[in-house]
Amino acid sequence: MPTGPLAPCFSLTHASVLLPDTMDFSSSTSAPFPAPAPMFSGSPRTAPDESGIWTVELVDHEAFSSVQLKRVFSLPDSRHVVVLVDAKALLRCADRDPTDYVLPAVPYWPSGKVKGLREFLEPGQTRIPEMPYVLFSTRRSPGLGGLVGLSREGVVSFRNGQHRARYLGFAGASCFPVEVHETEAESLRKYCGWVGAERS
C-alpha cells in the first residue's frame, strides 16, 4: 500500500475496507465553530508497530499531531476484529443511536472534559488508550425508499470510547480504527469503512 508522507492514518492487515454505499456523511450536529477539516491528499498507509499499536494522525491539532490506540480484545479467540472507519461516516451513524447516550459536538463539551480527553489521548504516556468499541446495526432509511424496504442506513452504538471517537473526528482524524464483533464487521465496513480522502 502507499506509504507517502501525507498518509493520514494506519490500519491492520486484517481490517480490509469495502466500498460503502453512496451516502452524505456531512455532520448533522451544528456547532458554534467548525471542527478542523482534514487537508491532505493520497491514500492511507498501513504501518502498525510490531506490538499492534495503531497511530492515528491528526490534522491542525496544535497540542499533538497523532494519537496511539491499542486493541480492546487482543486474544485470538475474542471474535472481535479491527475495522478502519471513515470518521465522518462513523459519527453520522452514531448520531442515529436510538439510546439517550449520544454526545454533542466537541465544542459544546465543558472545557474540563475537553482538557481531560486531550490529556488522556496525549502520546508518550505509559498507558496507551484503547480504540473505540462499537456495535453496528442497520434500519430502514427515512422516506419512501425506507418505507418500501429499498433503502437502509447504518446505526452505531458505542460500548466504549464515544468521547475518544468524537474528539478524534474533531481533531482532524480522517479515519481511525474501532473494534467490533466479527458478525457485524462486514456491515460496518460497508457503511463506514475508510476508502480514501474522496470518501470524506
Where are these regions (language model features)?
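Short, solvent-exposed loop/turn segments at secondary-structure junctions
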Residues: 90, 141, 163-165, 183-186
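Extreme N-terminal basic, low-complexity initiation segments
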Residues: 3-8
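Amphipathic, charge-rich alpha-helical segments that serve as recognition/docking helices
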Residues: 185-200
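ADP-ribosyltransferase catalytic core
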Residues: 176-184
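Short active-site loop/helix that positions an aromatic residue
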Residues: 162-174
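Short alpha-helix boundary/capping and kink motifs at helix termini
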Residues: 2, 13-15, 24-52, 57, ...
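Structured alpha/beta or helical-core interaction and ligand-binding surfaces enriched in interleaved
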Residues: 65
